[in-house]
C-alpha cells in the first residue's frame, strides 16, 4: 500500500492508499460520517461508513476526531464529480497521531486581532494556505523569469553600517563597538553586482521603521530589486512589464485553484498579461488629476487617492514617467529635456492598489553623484564605495524594485498586505 499526499490523489483512483491528514471539519448522518481533510498539499473529503469499520472506530470518528486532530487515514480513492474537490477517500481505517482539544479558531467569524494573535494557527486555514502557496509560486516564477533573461541572483547584506542624515526610518542595533542598521534596500549593493555580473537581482527582506498603520505598509517586507548594466529607461520598462506579465500568466497556469480560494478570478487577470502597458509622464498625470478634480500642482507627490484615480483611467498597470527630482532619490539622473525632473518611473497597479514598482536610470556621472552625496549628508566614509562605482569604468545602468507583498495584495485582491506574508510585522505587532 502506497503512502501519498492529497495532491497525488487523482493518480490513484481505485487504489487503497495511506495519507497523513488533519481534520478541518466533520458532520455525521446516521451510519455515515463526512470528514473534511487537509495535508498541506490540498483539501478533500473522507467518508466513513459504519459497515466499513469496526464499531469502535466509527464511534471514535464521531467523538475523538476534533478540528485539527492529526491522523493517518487508510482507504480507497474514488472520483466524485459532484464534490467541489473532485475526489474523496472511502476510509477503511485511521490512527490518531496528535489530539486537538479546544482548537481556538473555529468556523465562526473571528476579529482580525484575534486571528493575528493566533497567526501560527490561522495559517492552516484555507485562505492563508492559498495565499502562502501563491507567494511561494511568485518567488519561484521570479527566479525563472530572471534566469531566462540572463540575470544572476545576487545577495545584498541585511546589515549596513551607515544611516542617511536625518532619516528616522531605520532600525538600529548594536554591532560590537558601533551601530548597525537593518537594510531598507539592496539596490546600492546590487549596482555593484551589476558592474561585475551585468544583470543581477536581489530578493529578500527589507526593513522600514515607518510609523504607519496604512493597509500598504509593513515594518518588514520583501523586495525584488534588479539592476542592469548598459541599460536605459526604455529597455528597463520593457523588462518590468514583461516581468509582471510573466508572473500573472504563471499564476494563471499554476495557481488557478488558489486564486479562486482567495476570490480572484483567472479571467480578471488575463488583461494584465497584455503588453505593452500604458505610459504617461508625470506632467500628463498632473493634468489628468486636475481634470478629475484633484487639487494638485507640479511638484506634488502622489498618495493613494491620486494613484488609484490614475490607474483607474487605464484599467491595467500604467507607468508614470519622470517625476520632479525633489521627490525622488539622489542617484537618479536629471532628465535632459527638463532639468527639474529625473529619469525614473513608477508602475501603478489598477483596482486601488497603487505603486508596485519604482525604478530609474542610475546616474553614472562621478561628479554628479559626489555632489548629491554631499547634498544629502551622506559621508564619503560610508558611501565612498558607492562613489567608486562611477570612478572606475562607469556605464549607463538602470534598476527597479518591486514590493512582493504589494504585488501579492493586488493579484489576490487583499484589503491589507499583512495577509500576504506569513508573520506580518506591523507598528503594534511583533509576535508571533
UniProtKB/Swiss-Prot annotation:
InterPro entries: Aa-tRNA-synt_II, aa-tRNA-synth_II, aa-tRNA-synth_II/BPL/LPL, Asn-tRNA-ligase, Asp/Asn-tRNA-synth_IIb, NA-bd_OB-fold, NA-bd_OB_tRNA. It is found in: Cytoplasm. Pfam families: tRNA-synt_2, tRNA_anti-codon. Its EC number is 6.1.1.22. One of its GO terms (biological process) is asparaginyl-tRNA aminoacylation. GO terms for cellular component: cytoplasm. Keywords: Aminoacyl-tRNA synthetase, ATP-binding, Cytoplasm, Ligase, Nucleotide-binding, Protein biosynthesis. GO terms for molecular function: asparagine-tRNA ligase activity; ATP binding; catalytic activity, acting on a protein; nucleic acid binding; transferase activity. PROSITE patterns: AA_TRNA_LIGASE_II. It catalyses: tRNA(Asn) + L-asparagine + ATP = L-asparaginyl-tRNA(Asn) + AMP + diphosphate + H(+). Belongs to the class-II aminoacyl-tRNA synthetase family. Homodimer. This is Asparagine--tRNA ligase.
Amino acid at each position: 500500500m502506497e503512502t501519498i499526499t492529497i495532491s497525488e490523489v487523482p493518480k490513484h483512483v481505485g487504489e487503497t492508499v495511506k495519507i497523513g491528514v488533519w481534520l478541518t471539519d466533520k458532520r455525521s448522518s446516521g451510519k455515515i460520517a463526512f470528514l473534511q481533510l487537509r495535508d498541506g498539499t490540498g483539501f478533500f473529503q473522507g467518508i466513513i461508513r459504519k459497515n466499513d469499520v469496526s464499531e469502535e472506530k466509527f464511534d471514535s470518528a464521531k467523538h475523538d476526531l476534533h478540528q485539527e486532530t492529526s491522523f493517518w487515514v487508510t482507504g480507497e480513492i474514488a472520483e466524485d464529480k459532484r464534490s467541489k474537490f473532485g475526489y474523496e477517500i472511502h476510509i477503511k481505517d485511521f490512527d490518531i497521531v496528535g489530539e486537538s482539544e479546544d482548537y481556538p479558531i473555529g468556523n465562526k467569524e473571528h476579529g482580525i486581532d484575534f486571528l493575528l494573535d493566533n497567526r501560527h494557527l490561522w495559517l492552516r486555514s484555507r485562505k492563508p494556505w492559498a495565499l502562502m502557496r501563491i507567494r511561494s509560486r511568485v518567488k519561484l516564477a521570479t527566479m525563472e523569469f530572471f534566469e531566462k533573461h540572463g540575470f544572476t541572483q545576487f545577495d545584498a547584506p541585511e546589515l549596513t553600517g551607515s544611516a542617511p542624515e536625518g532619516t528616522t526610518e531605520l532600525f538600529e542595533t548594536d554591532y560590537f563597538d558601533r551601530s548597525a542598521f537593518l537594510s531598507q534596500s539592496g539596490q546600492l549593493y546590487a549596482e555593484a553586482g551589476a558592474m561585475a555580473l551585468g544583470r543581477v537581482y536581489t530578493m529578500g527582506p527589507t526593513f522600514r521603521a515607518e510609523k504607519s498603520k496604512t493597509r500598504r505598509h509593513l515594518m518588514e517586507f520583501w523586495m525584488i530589486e534588479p539592476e542592469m548594466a548598459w541599460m536605459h529607461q526604455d529597455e528597463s520598462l520593457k523588462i518590468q512589464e514583461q516581468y509582471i506579465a510573466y508572473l500573472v500568466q504563471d499564476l494563471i497556469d499554476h495557481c488557478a485553484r488558489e486564486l479562486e480560494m482567495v476570490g480572484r478570478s483567472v479571467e480578471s487577470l488575463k488583461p494584465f498579461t497584455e503588453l505593452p502597458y500604458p505610459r504617461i509622464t508625470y506632467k500628463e498625470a498632473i493634468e489628468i488629476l486636475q481634470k478629475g478634480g484633484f487639487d494638485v500642482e507640479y511638484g506634488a507627490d502622489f498618495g493613494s487617492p491620486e494613484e488609484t484615480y490614475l490607474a483607474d483611467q487605464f484599467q491595467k498597470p500604467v507607468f508614470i514617467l519622470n517625476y520632479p527630482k525633489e521627490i525622488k532619490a539622489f542617484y537618479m539622473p536629471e532628465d535632459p529635456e527638463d532639468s527639474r525632473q529625473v529619469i525614473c518611473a513608477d508602475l501603478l497597479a489598477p483596482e486601488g492598489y497603487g505603486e508596485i514598482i519604482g525604478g530609474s536610470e542610475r546616474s553614472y556621472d562621478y561628479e554628479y553623484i559626489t555632489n548629491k552625496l554631499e547634498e544629502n549628508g551622506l559621508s564619503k566614509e560610508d558611501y565612498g564605495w558607492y562613489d567608486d562605482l562611477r570612478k572606475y569604468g562607469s556605464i549607463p545602468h538602470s534598476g527597479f524594485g518591486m514590493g512582493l507583498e504589494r504585488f501579492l495584495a493586488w493579484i489576490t485582491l487583499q484589503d491589507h498586505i499583512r495577509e500576504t506574508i506569513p508573520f506580518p510585522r506591523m507598528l503594534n505587532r511583533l509576535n508571533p
